């Protein structure tokens, strides 16, 4: 290792939980926003500007965001990163490595 360079810090469980919470909020916000947008379009185009499609779309978005969050927290070993081809295994099937993103502090 070069002088002055520090070793990469080990990932703490608090940091991993924080990243999962951040990803959960971002995903839920995106899904709720998409549901509201689809609800607005459906309300204007098909339902004579009634408000229930907007509420229905936001509920569907919130429900899918909640479901994704539960799945993310229930499977602690899921790695979020890029899948990079690494050749083939002994049976001739493609093998992949998962490269996770390192957050700089």
From Swiss-Prot:
Topology with respect to the bilayer: Single-pass membrane protein
- Say where the protein is mainly found: mitochondrion
Per UniProt, subcellular location reads as: Mitochondrion inner membrane
Residue ranges for the region (Disordered) are: 85-105
Mitochondrial intermembrane side residue ranges read 47-105
| InterPro entries named in the record | Mic10 (IPR007512)
Signal peptide range in chain numbering: none
Keyword line: Membrane, Mitochondrion, Mitochondrion inner membrane, Transmembrane, Transmembrane helix
Q: Where are the transmembrane segments?
A: 29-46
The Gene Ontology CC terms held by the record are: MICOS complex; mitochondrion
Does the entry feature the keyword Electron transport, yes or no? no
The UniProt entry's sequence similarity note says:
Belongs to the MICOS complex subunit Mic10 family.
Function per UniProt: Component of the MICOS complex, a large protein complex of the mitochondrial inner membrane that plays crucial roles in the maintenance of crista junctions, inner membrane architecture, and formation of contact sites to the outer membrane.
Subunit organization: Component of the mitochondrial contact site and cristae organizing system (MICOS) complex.
Q: What is this protein called?
A: MICOS complex subunit Mic10
Its taxonomic path starts at: Eukaryota, Metazoa, Ecdysozoa, Nematoda, Chromadorea
């Amino acid at each position: 290792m070069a002088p002055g360079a520090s070793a990469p810090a080990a990932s703490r469980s608090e940091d991993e939980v924080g990243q999962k919470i951040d990803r959960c909020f971002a995903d839920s916000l995106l899904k709720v926003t998409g549901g509201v947008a689809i609800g607005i379009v459906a309300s204007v185009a098909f339902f004579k500007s009634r408000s229930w499609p907007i509420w229905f779309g936001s509920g569907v978005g919130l429900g899918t965001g909640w479901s994704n969050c539960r799945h993310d927290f229930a499977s602690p070993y899921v790695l979020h990163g890029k899948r990079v081809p690494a050749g083939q295994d002994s049976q001739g099937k493609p093998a992949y490595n998962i490269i996770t993103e390192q957050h700089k502090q």
